[in-house]
């Protein structure tokens, strides 16, 4: 269709946005699994594994909550894209922004549990953080592209905030 290039490109970027959120979940899960194992085994000169310390346990709990919330959100966005839901573009953009920015936060929080050793090349956390830092820029930057797209959606006179909830009339 002549003149439909922009719409076609936008549709391709919609699906890609949701997948960036999934990439973020994968990075967070890998970092969490490593850090959980580390916390269960590392004693840091004490008699008990560091997972017994409240600060470490809470950091792991917060990371797990963020991972599961992001996973569910991204699954919802990918499903909306797959079934061509009216709110798919909004959900995909939100999943990309939320997932990529949450991954950076969760990775740095988990690196604090491990400490300076997290930068050791034998430990995966440094590499995972490098990958996570690319996600807010990848597939349309969160600030320059994705938030602008979301802003445009929100400004539409016909915008229905319940569209992504499945509550809006279709």
Give residue ranges: language-model regions.
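C-terminal helix-coil-helix/basic helical segment that borders enzyme active sites and/or dimer interfaces
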Residues: 40, 44, 64-98, 111-119
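Alpha-helix initiation and N-capping motif
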Residues: 3-6, 32, 53, 71, ...
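Glycine-rich beta->alpha junctions and the first turn(s) of the following alpha-helix
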Residues: 1-68
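Glycine-rich phosphate/cofactor-binding loops in nucleotide/flavin-utilizing enzymes
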Residues: 114-170
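Alpha-helical transition-metal enzyme core signature, strongest for iron centers
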Residues: 25-32, 60-70, 74, 96-107, ...
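Alpha-helical scaffold segments that form or flank carboxylate-/histidine-based iron centers
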Residues: 17, 51-62, 88-98, 131-134
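A ubiquitous short alpha-helical element
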Residues: 23, 59-63, 91-95, 117, ...
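Generic, well-ordered alpha-helical scaffold segments in large soluble proteins
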Residues: 31-34, 38, 76, 109, ...
